[in-house]
């Protein structure tokens, strides 16, 4: 899959790590690793999500969605100090990205790059530099699809040669193409969030179920005071992942899925709204992510989601992960 639309920012400087750490709610990845980082407002609301690839102690590649380009560029530049010891370079138009993912991807990447792709040598959420078709690339072991996979980042001028080499290496493994609708279905199965649907400033980090990325034991960060107060008092709303039963009403469309802002009810009372939904083809289930009233959820005997004007019975997924909850395939 071609993902050149990613927005990319290269961050470097003697105090780059300290500066970035003061903006994000969680910890930064170690050198050689990649991790998700979240930016909150002063009120603790979700502003954006980025992946941070740590190239050196004070050097990072920040990657965010295509649709978030202007928002995230302005967000980063707005916080950038004028001390001159940090540089933030927009490299969005300089690089291309290919995503190779699936159970055969370790063999394909190994054949194309010459790297050992064994988990011990190239672990999940790490990156390495290598060459493919004589072109320098950065291979990052991560996949939004929830399978073993790599993002291959290369110079824009090299992408055709790199693509041809990857396809040639994948030919014995029946490597094919897939698109954004398939990727969106697969990320729902894994409980992965999407900016401006699941990740919006309508909700706080804690309401959005992102508490594991909020570290109160680190130095101060934007939104800490508000999130600390919410943590102590308790959130009023809760992020949930639901699976929906098949329709039992003969008039219901069996192929209908919940849509954005579909109503979620607890025991027949409006309790929240769907923020993402779709059909998971690997698990054969209709999936919806929603934010709902915490008290109503706690006492609910039945949860329903309105689909095409009719209620569909829904069931909580405590882990938020419907497919491969232990991430065994990601490490495969």
Ranges and model annotations:
Residues 1-332:
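Basic, glycine/lysine-rich polyanion-binding surfaces/domains
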């Amino acid at each position: 899959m071609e993902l050149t639309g990613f927005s990319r920012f290269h961050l470097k400087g003697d105090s780059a790590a300290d500066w970035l750490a003061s903006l994000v709610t969680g910890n930064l990845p170690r050198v050689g690793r990649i991790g998700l980082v979240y930016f909150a407002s002063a009120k603790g609301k979700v502003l954006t999500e980025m992946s941070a690839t740590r190239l050196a102690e004070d050097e990072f590649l920040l990657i965010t969605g295509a649709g978030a380009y202007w928002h995230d560029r302005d967000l980063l530049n707005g916080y950038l100090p004028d001390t001159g010891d940090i540089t933030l370079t927009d490299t969005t138009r300089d690089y291309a990205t290919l995503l190779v993912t699936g159970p055969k991807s370790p063999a394909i990447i190994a054949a194309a790059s010459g790297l050992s792709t064994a988990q011990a040598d190239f672990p999940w959420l790490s990156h390495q530099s290598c060459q493919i078709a004589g072109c320098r690339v950065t291979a990052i072991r991560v996949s939004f699809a929830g399978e073993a996979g790599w993002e291959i980042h290369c110079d824009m001028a090299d992408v055709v040669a790199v693509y041809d080499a990857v396809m040639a290496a994948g030919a014995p493994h029946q490597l094919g193409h897939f698109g954004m609708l398939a990727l969106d279905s697969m990320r729902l199965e894994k409980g992965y969030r999407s900016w401006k649907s699941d990740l919006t400033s309508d909700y706080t980090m804690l309401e959005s179920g992102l508490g594991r990325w909020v570290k109160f034991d680190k130095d101060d960060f934007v939104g800490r005071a508000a999130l600390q107060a919410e943590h102590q008092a308790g959130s009023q709303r809760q992020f949930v992942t639901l699976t929906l039963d098949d329709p039992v009403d003969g008039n219901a469309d069996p192929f209908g899925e919940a849509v954005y802002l579909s109503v979620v009810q607890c025991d027949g009372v409006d309790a929240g709204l769907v923020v993402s939904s779709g059909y998971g083809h690997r698990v054969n289930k209709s999936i919806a992510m929603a934010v709902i009233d915490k008290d109503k959820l706690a006492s609910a005997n039945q949860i329903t989601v309105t689909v095409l004007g009719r209620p569909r019975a829904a069931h909580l997924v405590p882990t938020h992960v419907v497919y491969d909850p232990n991430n065994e395939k990601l490490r495969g």
